[in-house]
């Protein structure tokens, strides 16, 4: 019974870590997409990074 509890806790911890890494990855990808679109429309990279981190 104790082993099962430890296993479940470990499993849940791994799942939550994987989920947060995934969502952080999605946010980073969205930010770089934002910067790329912004630069393509003629702004400089610094402006775009600031603009994209605010949204």
UniProtKB/Swiss-Prot annotation:
GO MF annotation list: toxin activity
Keywords: Disulfide bond, Neurotoxin, Secreted, Signal, Toxin
Cystine connections: 34-48, 38-52
Localisation: Secreted
Signal peptide: 1-20
Gene Ontology CC annotation, any one: extracellular region
Keyword Secreted: yes
Coiled-coil intervals, chain numbering: none
Keyword Heme set for record: no
Comment block on domains: The cysteine framework is XIV (C-C-C-C).
Listed name of the protein: Conotoxin Cal14.14
Source organism per UniProt: Californiconus californicus
Lineage: Eukaryota, Metazoa, Spiralia, Lophotrochozoa, Mollusca
